[in-house]
Amino acid sequence: LAFVLFAGILIGPFGSAARLFSQLKEAQGAMQRVFELLDTQPEVTDHPQAHTLPTIQGHVKFSGVDFTYDSRQPVLTDLSFEIQPGELVALVGPTGSGKSTIANLLHRFYDPTAGSIKLDGHDLREVTLESLYRQIAIVPQETILFGETIFENIRYGRESASEEDVIKASQVANAHDFITTLPDRYQTIIGEKGINLSGGQRQRIAIARAV
């Protein structure tokens, strides 16, 4: 009887130790993946003579652009087009036709295999990434919002932004009108992932943040 009681006492600690060991192994695997990510060298870097991109107007020119992912079939072949400043353009096509690739190339997440991409006459490979990223932004279809106020979500990209800056950005994104109808206006807590807002409202908040 004493042995059975003693074994019963030990089962709990041994079970906890086994669960802890399993959690530590999982954490070790996760940390290994984090370290591998941190050790990854960027494929796109600044050219030694790269210059700062001046304030852009928005003239985009693709000239004879080819692009291939990892030596696979070409995604883009001899693509050429121009977009004038202020012009609204929609890229339409089936899945895999290269729509996202064009956006990624414009943001210089990749460099083209051949041809050139120019913004206001500046080849993207000849300007610093920091000066490029400071002036352009992507608003994904799946918006990423935080369980904070509307004000903090819009200001997230530039914490030095004033209240006036935030309001101007929301006006550009056509978000100001619906924000002012909310009880707490810009101090409204939107919930995790913006759950308290509609899909369209979440998109406008994300656009305002990009602005």
Show the residue positions of the predicted features.
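Membrane-water interface of transmembrane alpha-helices in multipass transporters/channels
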Residues: 1-5
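Cytosolic ends of transmembrane helices, especially the final helix of ABC transmembrane type-1 domains
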Residues: 9-37
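Signal-transduction coiled-coil helices of two-component systems
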Residues: 24, 41-44
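Extended non-transmembrane interhelical loops and adjacent amphipathic helices
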Residues: 28-40, 59-63, 167
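Conserved E/DxxT/N motif and adjacent residues on the DHp alpha2 helix
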Residues: 36, 43, 155
